[in-house]
């Protein structure tokens, strides 16, 4: 069943500078959409604690149901070998916070992906995910090397730049409600620049 918020979009693709690998974020959560008949009452979003009811004839009364009708991972990060035409590896990107609170990790986030990727020649992939973290992976095998908590949701692809001989990773984090009352992380918001510690 297709969804209207993916598979791959929002700057969710990056290429390794030299080895022919492309990394793609995919969102795998289905959406049920229909039109209302004239005079028909718009239903609340069943399954969502917010019970949001909006005006209009466009209705997504199946979106927001949890757990979804598919198994995790809900969001994936996939490495494609363009020379061989094969998948090198695929992992769940981030965590669904409702499941992570129960000790279930690696599911990929079930929230809409609005982040992006950067791949470096030194073998790293930086990915912003809907779980409000920056994830750092080994580009060779998809092993997670680090995760950096943010104080808000990311929107748009991260950037990388150099200033005075030092390399920086720039991401955005915007305060927004958490889906379905999931736990809030504490972390920075706004434009956030990361860099490795300077050597003495």
Give residue spans per PLM region:
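A fold-level detector for beta-propeller and closely related beta-sheet-rich head/sensor domains
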Residues: 1-200
């Amino acid at each position: 069943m297709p969804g209207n918020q993916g598979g791959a979009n929002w700057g969710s693709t990056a290429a390794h500078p030299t080895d022919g690998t492309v990394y793609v974020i995919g969102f795998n959560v289905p959406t049920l959409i229909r039109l209302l008949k004239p005079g028909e009452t718009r239903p609340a979003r069943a399954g969502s604690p917010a019970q949001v009811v909006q005006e209009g004839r466009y209705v997504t009364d199946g979106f927001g149901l949890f757990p979804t009708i598919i198994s995790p991972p809900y969001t994936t990060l996939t490495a494609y070998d363009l020379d061989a035409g094969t998948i090198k590896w695929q992992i769940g990107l981030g965590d669904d916070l409702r499941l992570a609170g129960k000790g279930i990790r690696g599911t990929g986030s079930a929230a809409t992906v609005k982040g992006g990727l950067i791949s470096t020649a030194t073998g790293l992939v930086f990915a912003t995910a809907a779980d409000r973290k920056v994830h750092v992976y080994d580009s060779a095998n998809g092993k997670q090397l680090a995760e950096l908590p943010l104080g808000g949701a990311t929107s748009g692809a991260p950037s990388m730049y150099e200033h005075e001989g030092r390399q920086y990773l720039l991401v955005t984090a915007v305060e927004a409600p958490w889906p379905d009352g999931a736990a809030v992380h504490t972390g920075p918001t706004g434009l956030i620049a990361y860099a490795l510690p300077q050597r003495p």
